[in-house]
């Protein structure tokens, strides 16, 4: 859903993509917080993927932040180690695919989190399209 207007994103907007070799560093990965809930054997990573300026320009986006909460049973991986592994798997999937779009990035995250140690993935995105 477009967070500015509240309108649903169309299939054409979600599948509109750019070849990966046309852009340098198209995605920024950030880890906001790592939570260790008390009395559990889980760790929660709050990961944000941002589209860089050239990718947003090519896809006619004003803002694109994809936020994920990854609930894992992995207690040994720190935030930076998990982020490096997560970034590698997402980029590997997109490199094999060759096209970056909103849906392809979500599919890449699904690929990266389809592991034994991942319990749940919660998504909360902030996407705004250009009107002009």
From Swiss-Prot:
Alphabetized Pfam families for the sequence: Gemini_AL3 (PF01407)
UniProt keyword terms in alphabetical order: Host-virus interaction
An individual GO BP term: viral process
Similarity-based family: Belongs to the geminiviridae replication enhancer protein family.
Primary role: Increases viral DNA accumulation. Enhances infectivity and symptom expression.
The protein's assembly and partners: Homooligomer. Interacts with the replication-associated protein (REP). Interacts with host proliferating cell nuclear antigen (PCNA). Interacts with host retinoblastoma-related protein 1 (RBR1), and may thereby deregulate the host cell cycle. Oligomerization and interaction with PCNA are necessary for optimal replication enhancement.
Protein name: Replication enhancer protein
């Amino acid at each position: 859903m477009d967070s500015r207007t509240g309108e649903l994103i169309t299939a054409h907007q979600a599948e509109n993509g750019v070849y990966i070799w046309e852009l340098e560093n198209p995605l920024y990965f950030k880890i906001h917080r790592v939570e260790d809930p008390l009395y559990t054997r889980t760790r929660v990573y709050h990961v944000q993927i941002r589209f860089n300026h050239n990718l947003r320009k090519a896809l006619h986006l004003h803002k694109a932040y994809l936020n994920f909460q990854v609930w894992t049973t992995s207690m040994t991986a720190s935030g930076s180690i998990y982020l490096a592994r997560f970034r590698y798997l997402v980029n590997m999937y997109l490199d094999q695919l060759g096209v970056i779009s909103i849906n392809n990035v979500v599919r890449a995250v699904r690929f990266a989190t389809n592991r034994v140690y991942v319990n749940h993935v919660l998504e909360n995105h902030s996407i705004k399209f250009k009107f002009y």
